[in-house]
Each structure stands twice: as structure tokens, then as C-alpha cells.
UniProtKB/Swiss-Prot annotation:
All copies of domain LRRCT, residue ranges: 145-198
Family according to the record: Belongs to the LRRC3 family.
Keyword terms: Leucine-rich repeat, Membrane, Repeat, Signal, Transmembrane, Transmembrane helix
Stretches assigned to the LRRNT domain: 33-64
Membrane topology listed for this record: Single-pass membrane protein
Protein name (record): Leucine-rich repeat-containing protein 3
Repeat (LRR) residue spans along the chain: 65-86, 89-110, 114-135
Compartments (UniProt record): Membrane
Upper lineage: Eukaryota, Metazoa, Chordata, Craniata, Vertebrata
Gene Ontology CC: membrane
SUPFAM superfamilies xrefs: L domain-like
Coiled-coil blocks: none
Length: 257
């Protein structure tokens, strides 16, 4: 038997190892949630709530295993490229009630297959970034944005999976065709109207104007060329008239033998 009171090495190390594990666990918890956000437990899924925090940009320290991310009611004005590419498990993304005006073409890269809901309602989006949203399979909310109704918007909508519960609230804030301003976009398109036909007409008019300009230039050149030649011919004729003429002999011509 060993001496009384002497503890085994394992007994000595056990509390120390437990303390280390506890510290690492606490550090893991602290690092798993951005400072300005809350991360409640949702049935084992990681949810990050950053609503109404006065954020002006998207936090960079969001946990990689986040499933639900709420960034609504902040002051975010732009979504840069690759903002969420480190969140492959993200299923719901709420960016509503911000001041978003610009969305990078690769803003949602890495989310094409997994994202189920993207809320961009109540922002300042005027034009739909087709490159950023076209590859997503998620339902997208775009209501209450100052959209400019044009051909590019109409073409982009064909590639988006709009949320059916809010699609009727997407309206034309501005448009080249003033009769559609303030009207629901879906109602306008269902009536048979097309913003692309106006675009094509504008393009045709521009082409006709260009062709007319070239035709006018050609005619002007031809007129200038003809007048220039006429002037040269007139000067040449005057020059010939100014030459002294040879005297005409008045003697009768002798008959030819």
C-alpha cells in the first residue's frame, strides 16, 4: 500500500482537466454568438437574432452552423459579395426593414441549395439584382421596395421564386409608363402589359435615329462632292475662256491638187 494521504496522478489531474474543459466550453459559447446579438436555442438549431441592434453592416462573426439569421430592423444599406458564404447550413435569412439599396452579384453565394426563405421586404431596392437572386431556390419577399418597373425587372421576376403570401404587395414605384405607377406588379403583368415591348420600341427608335443620321451624312457628302465638282468645272471653263484665241487667216484656201 502506498503512503496515507498520497493521491494518485489521475486524481490530481482530473479537476484540472475538468476546469480546462469548462473554460473551453465557455469560450465556445462566447464565440458562437456575435456581441450585439442573441442566440436562443431552437430545438438544437443555431438561431442568431440581431434584430433592432442599429447595425450598419452584416456581422462577420456569425457561427458557421447558423440555421436562422435575423438581421431585420437595422440600418444595413448594402449586402456585399460573399456576406454569407461561410454559412452553408443557413435556411432562413431575414433582412427586412433595413435601408438596403445595393446587393452584390455574389452576395448570396454558397446559399443556393440550402436557403429556404429570404426576406428583403421594406428596403430601398430599386432594381432586382438577377445575378444575386436568380440562382436561389428560396422563397423571396420583395414587397414594399421602391422598384422601378422596367424590362430588366420583368425578366428577373421570371427566374425568382416569389413568396406567394406577399407577391401582391410588390408594386411599381416608378416606371417609364406612368399608368402603371403605384399598381401591383403582378396585376400589371397579368393584364398583358409588358415593359419589354416598350424597351424594344425605344431601342428601335434609337436605331432609326442612328440610321437617319448616317443617311443624312451620306447625302450631305454627296451634295458637297457634286457642288465641289461643279465649282471646279466652272473655274476650268472660265480659265479656258481667258486664254487668247489664235487669229483666223482670211486668205482663201488653195484647192487641193
Amino acid at each position: 500500500m502506498g503512503p496515507r494521504g498520497r493521491q494518485s496522478p489521475s486524481a490530481t489531474l482530473a479537476p484540472s482537466q475538468g476546469s480546462c474543459f469548462f473554460i473551453l466550453f465557455c469560450l465556445r459559447l462566447g464565440a458562437s454568438c456575435p456581441q450585439a446579438c442573441q442566440c436562443p436555442d431552437h430545438a438544437g438549431a443555431v438561431a442568431v437574432h440581431c434584430s433592432s441592434r442599429g447595425l450598419q453592416e452584416i456581422p462577420r462573426d456569425i457561427p458557421a452552423d447558423t440555421v436562422l439569421l435575423k438581421l431585420d430592423a437595422n440600418r444595413i444599406s448594402r449586402v456585399p459579395n460573399g456576406a454569407f458564404q461561410h454559412l452553408p447550413q443557413l435556411r432562413e435569412l431575414d433582412l427586412s426593414h433595413n435601408a438596403i439599396e445595393a446587393i452584390g452579384p455574389a452576395a448570396f453565394s454558397g446559399l443556393a441549395g440550402g436557403l429556404r426563405l429570404l426576406d428583403l421586404s421594406h428596403n430601398r431596392i430599386r432594381r432586382i439584382p438577377k445575378d444575386a437572386l436568380g440562382k436561389l431556390s428560396a422563397k423571396i419577399r420583395l414587397s414594399h421596395n421602391p422598384l422601378h418597373c422596367e424590362c430588366a425587372l420583368q425578366e428577373a421576376l421570371w427566374e425568382l421564386k416569389l413568396d406567394p403570401d406577399s407577391v401582391d404587395e410588390i408594386a411599381c414605384h416608378t416606371s417609364a409608363q406612368e399608368q402603371f405607377v403605384g399598381k401591383p406588379l403582378i396585376q400589371v403583368l397579368d393584364s398583358g402589359a409588358s415593359f419589354c415591348s416598350t424597351h424594344r420600341k425605344t431601342t428601335d427608335v434609337a436605331m432609326l435615329v442612328t440610321m437617319f443620321g448616317w443617311f443624312t451624312m451620306v447625302i450631305a457628302y454627296v451634295v458637297y462632292y457634286v457642288r465641289h465638282n461643279q465649282e471646279d468645272a466652272r473655274r476650268h471653263l472660265e480659265y479656258l475662256k481667258s486664254l487668247p484665241s489664235a487669229p483666223v487667216s482670211k486668205e482663201p484656201l488653195s484647192p487641193v491638187p
